[in-house]
Amino acid sequence: MVNLAAMVWRRLLRKRWVLALVFGLSLVYFLTSTFKQEERAVRDRNLLQVQDHDQPIPWKVQFNLGNSSRPSNQCRNSIQGKHLITDELGYVCERRDLLVNGCCNVNVPGTKQYCCDGCLSSGCCSAYEYCVSCCLQPNKQLLLERFLNRAAVAFQNLFMAVEDHFELCLAKCRTSSQSVQHENTYRDPIAKYCYGESPPELFPA
């Protein structure tokens, strides 16, 4: 009887250790993701500070990812999505289908490249990841170049900091002011992530 009780106790203790381990790993993952997202937001807020420029802005954006010095088997991605992730090649996938090298698994049926699901003709999308993926389409280059040439002073520092098409789309979809009607009100509460030049249609309050 004593041996049976000891065995049951050991099993319970082992399960508690497993649960504690799972909880600890989940907590570390959550804190890491939150820290990265906050770090990026702080960087953007700092870059948005207005400065005067007497000369044309020396844009550094490179639209040809093939010239990148980054290893070809590694991908940057949008990082913070809870369910979806977009990699720098324009693929959107579920977070569970993200490979260890940071790229979406293109062999999974749900992975799509240059996906504009939920995006309007104005260039505003219902999901951040689809906004970035759609923005990465090669035919969006001229639109983005026009935007860079007309960027408001308040955004000049932000977009001077980006170096390629992917970074530009990440910043454009995340910081667009075109989707905002008032400080805490979106013109379209659904399609609020914008890479385009035109604001979304204004929804009545």
Curated annotation (Swiss-Prot):
Tree of life domain: Eukaryota
Lumenal topological segments: 36-205
Residues annotated as glycosylated: N67
Topology of this chain in the membrane: Single-pass membrane protein
One CC-aspect GO term: Golgi membrane
Keyword Membrane (UniProt): yes
Keywords, sorted A to Z: Glycoprotein, Golgi apparatus, Membrane, Transmembrane, Transmembrane helix
Chief localisation class: Golgi
GO biological process: positive regulation of SREBP signaling pathway
Transmembrane segments: 17-35
Compartments, as annotated in UniProt: Golgi apparatus membrane
Pfam families for the chain: SPRING1 (PF10218)
Cytoplasmic membrane side: 1-16
Entry-linked InterPro entries: SPRING1 (IPR019352)
Signal peptide: none
Subunit annotation: Interacts with SCAP.
Family the UniProt entry places it in: Belongs to the SPRING family.
Protein function: Positively regulates hepatic SREBP signaling pathway by modulating the proper localization of SCAP (SREBP cleavage-activating protein) to the endoplasmic reticulum, thereby controlling the level of functional SCAP.
Record-given protein name: SREBP regulating gene protein
Organism the protein comes from: Bos taurus (Bovine)
Taxonomic lineage from the root: Eukaryota, Metazoa, Chordata, Craniata, Vertebrata
